[in-house]
Amino acid sequence: MGIDDFNELKLKMDDFQSKIHQFLIKNNQDLATKSETYWNSESEKIKKIEALKDKLRQLEEHQISLEEEFESSQREVSEVNAQSKAFLTKRDKLIGEREFLHKELDKLDILLKEQTKDLEREKQSRLLQSSKDTNEVALFETLLGLHISANAQDAITFHFTSRTVDVSPQLSITLDVSQDTYKITDSNPKLPQIIKNDLLNNLAATDDLRSFLKAARSHLSALTEAT
């Protein structure tokens, strides 16, 4: 090999090494930028996983390319031992980065599995609470002889079941629950305002809905019998 050929080869190797150096710098910058944002949300974490997988594939492909070019360089020039060591260093660095990405992917997988378990526990808790609420409503209806409807927004109507075979009209009372304090918006038969005030004051003081409904039924029954 002539000196000119060796110099030309050395220039090519230096240029190749510079390209590798710039590629790794850009890789490190890209990874550092993406690492700052992938914790923002669950959807971002999933996107990050896919991006990391793509980057991992790129690194693996680039590693293969480097190894092929390195082997070719070894066959062409045995004099560039120093450059060969640099290639080995770059390859080891790429392998280290790939292992780091594998660890990051494992961490994200674990985090997503934990979040999935948390969501499942929350779902089960809500289902349990919903079942509990339904059972409490059914208990009220059984104990007090009534059924409950919510035909209007923020309003609950309690229809009292008759203890006799034929009672007309049906006894009922409607509570507005949209405000901090309850309000009686309707009843059948119509309750005097003084009785409404007394019922609402007792409910506000005790927060005992069962006692409120018993008292309301008693007043409504008395008004029905009086007519």
Curated annotation (Swiss-Prot):
Which Gene3D superfamilies has this protein been placed in? Answer: Chromosome segregation protein Spc25
> What Gene Ontology biological process does one annotation of this record name?
chromosome segregation
Coiled-coil-forming residues are: 40-125
CC terms in the record's Gene Ontology section:
Ndc80 complex; nucleus
State where it is primarily located.
Answer: nucleus
Give the keywords, sorted: Cell cycle, Cell division, Centromere, Chromosome, Coiled coil, Kinetochore, Mitosis, Nucleus
Q: How does it assemble?
A: Component of the NDC80 complex, which consists of NDC80, NUF2, SPC24 and SPC25.
> What is this protein's record name?
Probable kinetochore protein SPC25
